[in-house]
A protein has these predicted regions:
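Phosphate-binding loop and its immediate beta->loop->alpha context
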Residues: 26-165
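Gly/Thr-rich phosphate-binding beta-strand-loop-beta motif of the actin/hexokinase/Hsp70
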Residues: 2-31
Length: 165
């Protein structure tokens, strides 16, 4: 499809949507962010499931719509042992939790100095991990489009985040 080897990827990590482009010696091509979809952008959302499944974009939204209602009560949760202490904050609050999370607004959270992680299933998900779910999905799309495994990435960021003085 492309002549020449790609030299870098460029990512626009947006609040709502993100995009990726492949840079060659003589040109830059924005590539579809999700295989099989006509759009060039990927929804900047991360899906987390207690079993370790991680998704980004439309796949994240679709998975959450199908599985978002599933939950565990603490009596049936492998993270909480009868009579034992637990790191699960949900167990101490209301005795149950959802099996899935759809994390939105990750870019907004980057601007917050008081936010470093979100907590689910007795574990903290660092902000960098949430961002990486989206970035890794974008990279897979660019690898598929370019036929290469490019390791060089260019990303910009706002000089000042909206709402910050």
């Amino acid at each position: 499809m492309n002549s020449g080897d790609p030299i870098a990827y460029g990512i626009d990590f947006g609040t709502s949507n993100s995009a990726i482009a492949v840079a060659y010696d003589d040109r830059v091509e924005v590539v579809p962010a999700e295989s099989g979809l006509a759009g060039l952008t990927l929804a900047s959302v991360a899906y987390l499931h207690r079993d370790g499944d991680r998704q980004a974009g439309e796949a994240a939204i679709a998975r959450y719509l199908v599985q978002g209602h599933l939950h565990h009560t603490c009596l049936h949760c492998p993270l909480v042992r009868y009579g034992a202490e637990t790191e699960c904050k949900q167990a101490t609050r209301n005795g149950g939790c959802q099996d899935t999370r759809l994390v939105t607004g990750v870019k907004r959270d980057l601007a917050r100095t008081d936010f470093t992680a979100t907590h689910s299933w007795a574990q903290d998900f660092e902000l960098a991990e949430l961002v990486s779910i989206v970035i890794e999905r974008l990279k897979r799309s660019a690898d598929e489009a370019s036929g290469a495994d490019v390791r060089r990435l260019v990303m910009g960021h706002p000089v000042v985040f909206a709402g910050m003085d």
